[in-house]
Amino acid sequence: MEPYAILYVTQEIEYLLKDSFLPKWELDGIKDLNTLWLERGRMACDTYAIGKIEQWSVRQLRAHRFLFISTKRKIRLKDCTISPDIFILKKELKEYDMKRFETLIGRRRVTLRKSFGNMLRAYAFQHVTVLHGSEAETLSYADPKRHVVKGQPKAAPMYDHPDRWWRDVDDGPTDKKLVSMLDYIIYSADEVYYVGCGDLKTLEQFASRDRKRFDRIKWICIDPIAPETSYANVKVVREKVVSARDLKHYLMRDEVERLLIWDVSADGLKGTIEWEKQRFKEDRNGENIAEALCADFALALIKHRIPEESDEYICRSSWLIPQPGAPITMYELRNLMRLDGYSHVERKHIPRAYARKIDAEVARRLVEEYHGEDVGRLLKRSLYEDIHIERADGLTDGDERTRADLFYLTNMRNVAFMHDVYRVVEKSFISTLWVSNRQNFTYDDVPVNRNFITLRFSKKNRRVLDGNGAILFLMWQHPKDFPKTMNYDPSWAENYAVIFYHALTSPVPDLSLCRFIGLRLMSSTLRINSDRAHQVTDILKKLGLDVSGHLFICLMSNSYVADLDWWFRMILEWSVKDREGKLAALSEAKAELIEWRDEKADEPWHIKNDLLAALFEFIYFAKHFDINERYVESWIQYLRNA
């Protein structure tokens, strides 16, 4: 069974649901945890929920995959007040019909996916050095002085490879041209020398957009018209730069990564031959100064105006790239030059700047293909990734530093190398595997069986959880770093298994371990579709013996990712306590439950032999899931030795 969502809507939205074909779940009559769990388990598709939820905590509702939809800015729960995951302005609600409402939900849920990914990256950033399979989101949160961001991003459009130019129908507008330029180029720079900075409005707009990145850079802004500024990290120099000597004496410390931005454009009579020559000279002068100071700068980004009267010309360049946010009438590229100065990032995939002949017609076509004020968002992202992500195949990279492998291992291109994928998971500090069989229109991931992951990867101090469980675990264990009020889509998160290192201080059955939602539904489904699935377990129970139904159905249904080391320790160490002992351990660990039967509280939930019986019975079925019996037998041995 796939992880379907509960779409909770507040009262003022309920009237829309009359036209929905999805089920509607009334919550008002539910009084206890177990009833909530049992009723939730009957739902085998996305379901709307209405009614009172103040008696439940946010983690309990997230465990049931609740998404909160409201026109209210805040929703009150048992333990906190949260912002809705999907907010609708009340004055706009009257314009919605069911189709528009559900379209909005679909679009907003896509944006919520990023929140899940960012939370996993935040945990990774705390513990690892190398991040594989990286995209723009990784760069945006990485510390270039501490983290090595590796991957194989799609090549950005550039002059050299017109055969690889691409367009995307999902593209849209981005920031203004120069703000976009700063956004994609400054990633790892300690010092930026901005020659031709103008009136500093570009810098101010970028500071307003991303103050954290702005503040970590020392800016040297050089332009005769530059005004004074109150920014402590900005030095203004009101001079012209006409030679390398003019710039050299402003270079400050050693062993820092420096970036040169050259955006010099003097006044002239537009359209004249003299103006064309002046523009050409200014751009070549920027290249010459960058080359003369090549030992001081890691990168230079030079203004590159395409001559109107020339078919071919010579420049010094690594890449000629289009400009996100530039008007389609602006026949100007940016010239990226990789130089020899110190850099935090390995950029061997970018050729060292060299003198080269440029075909002006190809350069103009590059402008016409990518410039325009209604496009540029994906171009900027692509440039950002292509310039700053170190090229490496995560499956073969020999870097032995602590690593993270998020959101790429189960891509279609790795399907022939699953042995290497599993080897990477074994050595990675945190990794993800796609486990869902639902249709995925966004990514080309191939699912891995949940029961295989459950049996293969769990061990002491290594957690194996679905993505929702991983987030709930981090909220439980690290509430300051991962507040429980954070917005994310729990059902989307459960499309992934997350395997990560984290010690377990207390083996209590916190709801992050596994929720087993729909377990009884899956058990009934197996029973009515097979004469063999329950045969042996039924006989054992008639003989007065017991089998862990949770464990058996978990493995047989292939619907759940569970941490067996934690689970078995919970049964052997916590479940044997009496009611008071159980509750005391839960209280001390600040854990929360998703199911609890008070009438059984003094009894063990199961004993070792119940777990062994479930594993022995599953061995018969393991071959149907292409699971080697040794992975089951290793857990049988684990229990025998416990």
UniProtKB/Swiss-Prot annotation:
Subcellular location: Virion
Principal place of residence: virion
Keywords from the named record: Capsid protein, Outer capsid protein, Virion
GO CC terms: viral outer capsid
Assigned protein family: Belongs to the orbivirus VP4 family.
Described purpose of this protein according to its UniProt entry: The VP4 protein is one of the five proteins (with VP1, VP3, VP6 and VP7) which form the inner capsid of the virus.
Protein name per its UniProtKB record: Core protein VP4
Source species taxonomy: Viruses, Riboviria, Orthornavirae, Duplornaviricota, Resentoviricetes
Gene encoding the protein: Segment-4
